[in-house]
């Protein structure tokens, strides 16, 4: 049996569990009997939450894959080049400018901030010709820390700490109807990678080789940055941060299937969705009836895998 078939079956099982498990009892028997309360719970809470997990997880995993492709660095991802922290900064600035900022205003500020600071980071890495692959995440973590510190200072100075924490903590517990629709913008990056997978794969060969093969490298690089910034922004304003997801999932898949996006795109989306769904289900049952933050579980798993990847990458560069 193909791994993709197994992952698809596992995903369906996790979707079933995600809809079934929660603080409120959900009965499939009542669901198929068209019980009004059960259907209300399904439509207003369980279904939106499950859909938001699938969209956020698959799109953020794909954003990591795309970031690694355009930088030719396996450790690049929204969380390691400052994109995630920049989106958080944009959200805080939106709350400062508009105390009762709408989701649209938060989205625009987060998007503008994330694309601006990501461009600055990539320009810095290019100007100083940082060649070692393992240096990118280290510099990126420092860079993210600086942005995060500025964000904290602004939030503290203008009494926005509580609002910032509530909006940026990775959790799906508050997802309901009319609160997750922005995540459908994540479909843009999924469709783009699906349609342009061969073109993005050629970008792995570098700028000179890509342009010699007729690829408009600069245009596609800007498109990729736009897609990554958009995906990171809508995820941040809707569910908060999903740490290390964009790093570990593409790396695990590329080690098995190589750098051809035509072969990795589906697997990256499936593994990302399965991982976040599993973490979300665990977050509901570990201290039931209370919930843990999904970002906490993802952070524990992701940090361990990331350290292992970083250690192996450093050893290869040393050799």
Task: Give a label for each model feature.
Residues 1-319:
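Alpha-helical transmembrane segments in inner-membrane proteins
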